């Protein structure tokens, strides 16, 4: 299964449980008229949002079963683990649910 398909399934599963999760775009985009638009920083997780029960910030990196974190993603992971947020690497909707509802921490 592709990362995009897993991500879509995760977002749907999380919405169905009442939490909110949004797709994140990192890096930069060059428009047709050659303007550069900076998005989120490199390494920012694939999805972010908030938990319905307390509004706690969620950041979830989505990977396939064999996917590995890039150096920029490892840097964000190291930072996230020092913050009072919900962060993890999810390879399935159940992983994401566990991160959000049970405080599970998944690494690569």
Identify the function of each model-found stretch.
Residues 1-108:
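Catalytic phosphate/metal-binding cores of nucleic-acid and nucleotide-processing enzymes, i.e., regions
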């Amino acid at each position: 299964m592709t990362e995009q398909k897993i991500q879509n399934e995760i977002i749907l599963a999380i919405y169905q449980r009442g939490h909110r999760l949004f797709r994140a775009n990192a890096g930069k985009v060059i428009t047709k008229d050659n303007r550069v638009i900076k998005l989120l920083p490199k390494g920012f997780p694939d999805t972010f949002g908030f938990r319905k029960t307390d509004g706690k910030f969620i950041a979830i990196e989505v990977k396939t079963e064999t996917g590995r974190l890039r150096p920029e993603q490892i840097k964000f992971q190291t930072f996230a683990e020092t913050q009072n947020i919900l962060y993890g690497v999810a390879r399935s909707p159940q992983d994401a649910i566990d991160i959000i509802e049970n405080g599970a921490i998944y690494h690569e």
